[in-house]
Amino acid sequence: MNPKFKIELLEDVNEFLNGLNEKAREKIIYNLRKSQVVNDNDLFKKLNDNVWEFRTLHNKTKYRLFAFWDKTDKTETVVISTHGIEKKTQKTPKKEIQKTEQIMKQ
């Protein structure tokens, strides 16, 4: 299957992924690729009008990569992932959503 969109990882995401153990990193990358071809809220979920999250559960740990749609290029659909966290609470921290919105404005 062809990907529905391209994913661009910013430096903060790469640093986050490099800080994880290999199995967790592999699972997140697998889920990123899978989210490009299937429509599944368990993998890629809208948080508000502008912010989305890539979701991964590995060994009872919830990982989130925050992202937004880049609509500047009319020929290609791109999702830009801004940063990642290990989610420790039920609700997504507002500061993480705000961080994504700030990066989006740059």
PLM-predicted stretches and their roles:
Residues M1-K62, K71-V79, E86-Q106:
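Basic, Lys/Arg-enriched alpha-helical interface segments
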